[in-house]
Amino acid sequence: AEYVHAGKFFFRAGDWSGLLEAVRRDRGKSINGEHQEEFVKWSSECPPEKLAQDLDAILVMMRKLFSFRQIPEMLRLHGILMERLKSDRSLNEEDRNNYRGECELVMSFLKYNDISAMSELHRSACSLMNRVSRSIDPKGTWTFGSPSVAMMFHRIAGMLDHENREMHECMPYYYQIVDYHGNG
């Protein structure tokens, strides 16, 4: 909660670096529905050149924007991140690939609740990354408020056994890049 308060003060002061640091450190854990309007304002009013300086914060913001169904703003941040990766030669190839992979992970949520489609992006992330995600807290919630994992991905009547097999096939790729988040 202290990161939310810090973010509010950084925003009021126009201290974008401080705001982005608070977002990055919190990993979005303290930001919930009551902060949605304010959080979207932080994202939309932060200058793109400041956002581009903190790729980890962009990834956290993208994930929270997805949760808040603010997809156009999420995609705007995705564009800023991808442009920075394309144009900034100060990033080495390893870092560039880790950020690309983490971006694939966050973008996979746009495929929710199709586990196979999500897994395509998780597999891509696995091939790019040599570290675990920094934008997802492995101790954080996993089910988007759903009472069960089966309920999250069960989409077609009569297909639960097939969907369960899909989960067992697909989830190891997700676990690999998120330090086993959700493997409970």
Where are these regions (language model features)?
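Internal alpha-solenoid helical repeat scaffolds
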Residues: 49-184
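Extended alpha-helical scaffolding segments used for macromolecular assembly and cargo binding
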Residues: 1-68, 73, 77-80
